[in-house]
Amino acid sequence: MTYSYTEKKRIRKDFGKLPAVMDVPYLLSIQLDSYHDFLQQDVAIEDRQEVGLHAAFKSVFPIVSFSGNAALEYVSYRLGQPVFDVAECQLRGVTYAAPLRVKVRLIIYDKESSTKAIKDIKEQEVYMGEVPLMTENGTFVINGTERVIVSQLHRSPGVFFDHDKGKTHSSGKLLYSARIIPYRGSWLDFEFDPKDCVFVRIDRRRKLPATILLRALGYAADEMLEMFFENSLFEVEGGEYFLDLVPSRLRGDIAIFEIKDDEGNLIVEEGRRVTARHIRQMEKAGLKRLRVPSSYLLGKVTATNIADPSTGEVIVECNTEITDDAIEKIEKAGIKRIETLYTNDLDCGPFVSDTLRIDATRSQLEALVEIYRMMRPGEPPTKESAENLFNNLFFSEERYDLSAVGRMKFNRRLGREETEGLGVLSHSDIIDVLRTLIDIRNGKGVVDDIDHLGNRRVRSVGEMAENQFRVGLVRVERAVKERLSMAESEGLMPQDLINAKPVAAAVKEFFGSSQLSQFMDQNNPLSEVTHKRRVSALGPGGLTRERAGFEVRDVHPTHYGRVCPIETPEGPNIGLINSLATYARTNTYGFLESPYRKVVDGLVTDDIEYLSAIEESDYVIAQASAAVDENGRLIDELVTVRHKNEFTVMPPEKVTLMDVSPRQVVSVAASLIPFLEHDDANRALMGSNMQRQAVPTLKAEKPLVGTGMERYVAQDSGVCVVARRGGVVVSVDAARIVVRVSDDETEAGDAGVDIYNLTKYQRSNQNTCINQRSLVMEGDEVARGDVLADGPSVDLGELALGQNMRIAFMPWNGYNFEDSILVSERVVQEDRFTTIHIQELTCVARDTKLGPEEVTADIPNVGESALAKLDDSGIIYIGAEVEPGDILVGKVTPKGETQLTPEEKLLRAIFGEKASDVKDTSLRVSTGMRGTVIDVQVFTRDGVEKDQRAKEIEQTELNKFRKDLNDEYKIVEGATFERLRSALLGQSVIGGPGLKKGDTLTEVHFNAFEKEEWFKLNMADEQLNELLEKAEGQLQERRKSIEDRYEDKKRKLQSGDDLAPGVLKIVKVYVAVKRRIQPGDKMAGRHGNKGVISAIKPVEDMPYDEQGNPVDIVLNPLGVPSRMNVGQVLETHLGAAAKGLGDKINRMLAEQKQAAEIRKFLHEIYNGIGGRNEDLDSLSDSEVLVLAANLKKGVPMATPVFDGAKEKEIKEMLRLADMDDSGQVWLYDGRTGERFERQVTVGYMYMLKLNHLVDDKMHARSTGSYSLVTQQPLGGKAQFGGQRFGEMEVWALEAYGAAYTLQEMLTVKSDDVNGRTKMYKNIVDGDHRMEPGMPESFNVLVKEIRSLGIDIELEAN
């Protein structure tokens, strides 16, 4: 087994027993793949699939003019290069996007000719706005901020059958319904009412009898009856009636006459119910015709019109009940055949027949008019408009589209063979749906489960962007149609026809303000990954929080391996926002799939098959943990399996598939919780969610007890620097890494240099600090995919959200009552939970009515000391330490002119403008913020002179860029000459600098040559001369391209910035604030065990063990039993063992033991106790010593979810670390020195500091701003608001009879305007009296009552 550069430095002891069949897939692929398919940027034009942008254009074009004489066709599109790269976009606050250019063809036909002859063709590229590009980490930069488009889980298009669960009618009768949901277009519902008639609704409007829809489709009444019913045939012979008998149809009827066979033997007596036995006897006797009395026909319903044979007059219409009167007419007319509908109450109800009776329409036109009236009430219908409306509803490709998914689901549900077909409905589609609905009502077939993941599909970024794009194009289409008619006469070009604004607006609106376009959660790498893998049922076209019931939110059996059953927010969104399971992916239709291993005759293979929830139900699926022997054969007699969404047991030979990994059930966040299998689900949910809120600490520390998923999350999150290609590290400093790529990975003409600029102290969306630290040294060899630099919350390429703390479970003087946490002062001293937060403060200089605002150090009425930290431009220096009230950017605003006296006017006219008054509007540090200025950015409008500071910043940027380019060139040049040297060494020359014909080149010559002299060599071998020429050409080309890039960068930097109207200059100041941990901060473990720090106590007061080592944190043991998250206790024990082993290794290193001895001990740890074996023999002695040095602080362990360390193994580990296997020790009280009366569980737990810091929440106000109407203080820290003294608080004061306190609360401390200003003045003068007056809110009440027309006046008392 090969270890990567970082892995071999610190190997995790893995307790997993199950084989790794399949690696964890790339975690962001759902975002990247979806958007890649949308853009198809790197696909050749002719190879583009009909998806994404291509499909959107194809669906709207060609656009034909109203007259049909001109058409605009779509040819292809291409995306240009973005103007700014990602970093520049974030800095400048612009969108990272590429211009979209579409090639269209305008065709004008000849009006005069009878056939369509083409008169003119014009082709042109048209600019269609900008399309946002996705960064390589699956995010979008919109207006300078990183955003994520969350995938949406919505109801798949298709047909669904359901019932109302008996809620509609008081009798509790189940009313069945069918609904055809298209991808876009009108919904079509069929539903039963309590009287068993079938109705239809279009777009949830008022209902009509379903037969109206069938009539509108062109079916007559008898055709409808023929489609939905079987007929019974009666023949009339000599006044007697004979029934063509189908024996099974009599079942359950009560015989109203005796039934005999042809020989006259009695089969059923009169008055008896016909049973299955009777039917068998009739079939045996071969009874084909049965003589029935005429009364048997009464109440039967005719299937066709019965007409008099002689006159042709209809005696009995179809679908009417036969009465005595009708029988008389039939006999009179001498009719020989009567067809009636066969119905019964069991499995063949008379639903369509009953519906036809309540249907008042008689012809297709009447039906169309009826539908028109329902859709457009109040508009007078005409034949054309009624027909148009109906055809556009379901049969027009422009208005209606089932989509490929919808058609596939539709055909599957109706049991058809083919899965493809038209996007619009056909007549047979509607009839089949109605027929299936009636079958379900008749008891054949079942209703659908709408929460089944086979009926819900995922819409990812690409698809949603495509829909928005199509919306924009449809708007464009309307405008183009109108202009096309002009194009015929005026010879316009395509560019004049298309206005791209609507497209750009639709796309911008989607990315900027859609409910699913969210501000990226950037607290730490895990929160980024989770955000991109989130699946939401909310959003446009989805559910709303208020309407979503319990079933939608619940865990469904089909979630297994597709959606995580654990990770979902607490609160109103629970169950509506989910996370993808670790191995899940979406298929072409958008359904979630999960991977399984194939099992053949009880033998588990390594073939992997992805299945969606629909396909999965037919298989028998064993769990990943099922016992197998070394050949991969299932050993148990009965295996736990899933089959048809149920858990059961089956013999091994029936098993067809097996899970890939135990963690395929849960999401990434849940799979990071060690011993997850020992935690209660509710606490695991909190654990998953709180890991996302962990703030990156100053020094990241890997968890001693992990799950093995940490490495995947860190690498896939994109916060680390990962080597794009293998090679040798040439130079490293704090801000960049340069790698010379190895020859086998470079393509011809490629530089073979990779420069990685590290992100230094950048602000994240959550104001945490993003900083990358290099891991490599000069001369190190790295392979593709190795981690070169750690990001925030990453330690040696592993996710590290918190710190390993030494904890004890014991009470301590009530300081850990109710989940409080007691912390040692040492934790603060060692900066274990110190975090850096970066605030961005912005100062905007605008052009006002009175003149421009100015950024300057010349501020009126400000002392020298306040300006000490500002430079000449009035902007603070980088590195300055600032505190509340300090000026960051000096700015002055022109004040309104006072009225001038005539004398002053005269003087001003004579002596010129006197500097008009200005007021100080500088940007100052807000209250409660102390920190260091780490960066300043100045943006200046085009045409405004840049200040000195802006020029300096610009120059620094350019110099940095120049250095990168020079280094790149140096390495390329070095590599080129290296290649030439090896090719030319020992070859003979014809001529050259200081050489004569026939000389042989040696090392001495090469060292003496100047660089340009190499290319003056004339070699005897022609091929070598070509090589020299080519090398010279390549270097010149490279030099030119580097100069071009430099000039391009210079142009970008020196051009003015595109600022909002009226803005002249923007100065952004970044202040880094160091936050140490303090009482009131929220901390948590990974098992949902959260708490608030109650106190920080001196080290000497903390409990200590027999060696004198104090604990760092004291937790309350009562937090464990009721919460049932025992995982934290197991983690504590295993953490203790890991730390103990680290101490043991540390002692060995201190005693300078031989590498062989250390290797032997490492073998015991890694390969002696349970879990996977590590290949330590592949490491050299020096690598073993590096590994040991990295294990000094503890041996990291991995206990994968559902496949983790067993209790026995934890005990063995504790013994190996020379510790008591109970995991408990004697502790002594730090204050008295006495031993506690029983042993205490002490170990190491991984604790996180969450982004709920007391600094951000603590707030106090004396006076401040007030609400405009009520004049009451505002609320909340952001508005600098007051504390609300609410209704209940008033009751409390009333209960105590504290009348004066209550009076001041309701008046001078709230909204009595005069009273409070007077009181403020009095307090300033040292006088503490107050005069309460009328609260403003009372005046508001009086005004509101008056506005109702009721006069109300206050009487003076």
Swiss-Prot record:
Superkingdom classification of source: Bacteria
Coiled coil, from the record: none
Catalysed conversion reaction: RNA(n) + a ribonucleoside 5'-triphosphate = RNA(n+1) + diphosphate
SUPFAM superfamilies the UniProt entry points to: beta and beta-prime subunits of DNA dependent RNA-polymerase (SSF64484)
Cysteine-cysteine disulfides: none
Keywords noted in UniProt: DNA-directed RNA polymerase, Nucleotidyltransferase, Transcription, Transferase
GO biological process: DNA-templated transcription
Gene Ontology MF annotations: DNA binding; DNA-directed RNA polymerase activity; ribonucleoside binding
Any Pfam family the entry gives: RNA_pol_Rpb2_1
Enzyme Commission number(s) from the entry: 2.7.7.6
InterPro entries: DNA-dir_RNA_pol_bsu_ext_1_sf (IPR042107), DNA-dir_RNA_pol_bsu_external_1 (IPR019462), DNA-dir_RNA_pol_su2 (IPR015712), DNA-dir_RNAP_su2_dom (IPR007120), DNA-dir_RNAP_su2_hyb_sf (IPR037033), RNA_pol_bsu_bac (IPR010243), RNA_pol_bsu_CS (IPR007121), RNA_pol_bsu_protrusion (IPR007644)
Any one of the GO CC terms: DNA-directed RNA polymerase complex
Chain's role: DNA-dependent RNA polymerase catalyzes the transcription of DNA into RNA using the four ribonucleoside triphosphates as substrates.
HAMAP family membership: RNApol_bact_RpoB (MF_01321)
PANTHER family xref list: DNA-DIRECTED RNA POLYMERASE I SUBUNIT 2 (PTHR20856)
Oligomeric and partner information: The RNAP catalytic core consists of 2 alpha, 1 beta, 1 beta' and 1 omega subunit. When a sigma factor is associated with the core the holoenzyme is formed, which can initiate transcription.
Family membership noted in the UniProt record: Belongs to the RNA polymerase beta chain family.
The name this protein goes by in its record: DNA-directed RNA polymerase subunit beta
Organism: Hahella chejuensis (strain KCTC 2396)
